[in-house]
């Protein structure tokens, strides 16, 4: 596979750009997660960054990418409403894996947002989307810009939700290359990787949580629920970071 030039790809007509990415993805689908990361580091432009919500399976991508690219910036968008267990998990993994953690937050504090807008997460889809734009999307865009990121790694998996079921290994999003090394992993593969490397799930996994975000928009899984129903009251699956 030849080295990909972001500017050259963006200059192509849309159909040609889609075909070029599809050809590369067909080859990447045959590689292991480790091989995908290695390929990206060799063939895609730096600077590189890895985003993480420090959710249930976060240790997998953090370990995988950091092993091949030590000191890669790890971007966390902190809303101020994460579970106490999440903040503890962040500290634990940062220390254990020696992560180069970069924390980005909204330009308005959580208290100031509530004073101005009320509890946005209780205001339906429109309120949730505004909340996500302020607390997730804008801080992430700022992080990518300030870190001069051209290649962005993330730990999404197709099995997690319908909205992720058709995502490719490689895409262009927010003006940068986006690489999803474990996109085709199932829950068993995640478990096996964690066991092999002495890593843990998020502490709330043992309490029945399949997905963990903010305290006010995360629910425990109950029989009959799809995983996406445990977030944002079932109104949305994505927080905005991986859309668009």
Swiss-Prot record:
Classification via InterPro entries: PAPS/APS_Rdtase, PAPS_reduct_dom, PAPS_reductase_CysH, Rossmann-like_a/b/a_fold
Q: In which pathway does it act?
A: Sulfur metabolism; hydrogen sulfide biosynthesis; sulfite from sulfate: step 3/3
**Chief subcellular location:** cytoplasm
> What EC number(s) does the entry state?
1.8.4.8
Would the keyword Cell cycle be found if you checked this record's keyword annotation?
no
What enzyme class is recorded for this protein? oxidoreductase
Active site, renumbered: 239
Instruction: Please give the start and end residues of each transmembrane region.
Output: none
Q: Which Gene3D superfamilies match?
A: HUPs (3.40.50.620)
| Keywords in alphabetical order | Cytoplasm, Oxidoreductase
Can you say where in the cell this protein is located?
Cytoplasm
Quote the catalytic activity from the record. Answer: [thioredoxin]-disulfide + sulfite + adenosine 3',5'-bisphosphate + 2 H(+) = [thioredoxin]-dithiol + 3'-phosphoadenylyl sulfate
Q: Which GO terms describe its molecular function?
A: phosphoadenylyl-sulfate reductase (thioredoxin) activity
Extract one GO BP annotation from the record. sulfate assimilation, phosphoadenylyl sulfate reduction by phosphoadenylyl-sulfate reductase (thioredoxin)
Family indicated by similarity: Belongs to the PAPS reductase family. CysH subfamily.
Provide the function of this protein: Catalyzes the formation of sulfite from phosphoadenosine 5'-phosphosulfate (PAPS) using thioredoxin as an electron donor.
Q: Which HAMAP family does the record associate with it?
A: CysH
Which protein is depicted?
Phosphoadenosine 5'-phosphosulfate reductase
What species does this protein belong to? Answer: Klebsiella pneumoniae (strain 342)
């Amino acid at each position: 596979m030849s080295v990909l030039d972001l500017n050259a790809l963006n200059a192509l007509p849309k159909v040609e750009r889609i075909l070029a990415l599809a050809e590369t993805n067909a080859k990447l689908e045959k590689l292991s997660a480790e091989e995908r990361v290695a390929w990206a580091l060799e063939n895609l432009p730096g600077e590189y960054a890895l985003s993480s919500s420090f959710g249930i399976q976060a240790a997998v991508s953090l370990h995988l990418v950091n092993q091949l690219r030590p000191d890669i910036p790890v971007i966390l968008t902190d809303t101020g409403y994460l579970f106490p267990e999440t903040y503890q998990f962040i500290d634990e993994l940062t220390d254990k894996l020696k992560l180069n953690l970069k924390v980005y937050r909204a330009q308005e504090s959580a208290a100031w947002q509530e004073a101005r807008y009320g509890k946005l997460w209780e205001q339906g889809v429109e309120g949730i989307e505004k909340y996500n734009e302020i607390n997730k999307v804008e801080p992430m865009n700022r992080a990518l810009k300030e870190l001069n990121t051209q290649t962005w790694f993330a730990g999404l998996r197709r099995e997690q939700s319908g909205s992720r079921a058709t995502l490719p290994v490689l895409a262009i999003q927010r003006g940068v290359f986006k690489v999803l090394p474990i996109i085709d992993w199932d829950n068993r593969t995640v478990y096996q990787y964690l066991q092999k490397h002495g890593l843990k799930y998020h502490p709330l996994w043992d309490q029945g949580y399949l997905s963990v975000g903010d305290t006010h928009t995360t629910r425990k899984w109950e029989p009959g629920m799809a995983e996406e129903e445990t977030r944002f009251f079932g109104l949305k699956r994505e927080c905005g970071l991986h859309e668009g």
